[in-house]
Amino acid sequence: MKRKILLVDGYNMTAFWRETRPFFHRGELDAARTILLQKLSNYASFEGLEVICVFDAQYMPGVRQTYEEFNVTVVFTEEEETADDYIERLAAELNTPKNQVSVATSDLNEQWTVFAQGALRVPARELEKRVAVTKSDLNKLSGQINLQRPPLRPMDSQSLRDLQKMMEKKDDL
């Protein structure tokens, strides 16, 4: 089975997604990034994806770092490197017969470039919809689980006999 990898243009997503857009436009990039990463984490866990979210250094000059947050690999590019450049290079490296690489961006030039390299393209709106559907599915599943009354399973006959023996021994004490 192929390893599924989703490369995300982080600031592109935060600028387009309904929930993160207001934070992005007010310059509250930390809040926008946190919301995006939390949503991507839930989506990735449910879908069995590895997510690498790339942010341009233009908004955080001199940072260049890679770290894990919410089970998502977060990359801040070099100061002179765009997220597009980094994603194109990484998509080319990762696109092997063992990997299925998808790139989430609404930048049409970027979509065509990575598509030409064999990666799948996912526009921002489509990824936002996929994440929303996953959240809805998770909510339905969690609503079906009743932690107050776990489902009862009938005891098999051997376990029932063992329990009766233990109770008889206790009564003898």
Where do the language-model regions lie?
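Nuclease catalytic cores that cleave nucleic-acid phosphodiester bonds
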Residues: R3-V8, N12-L173
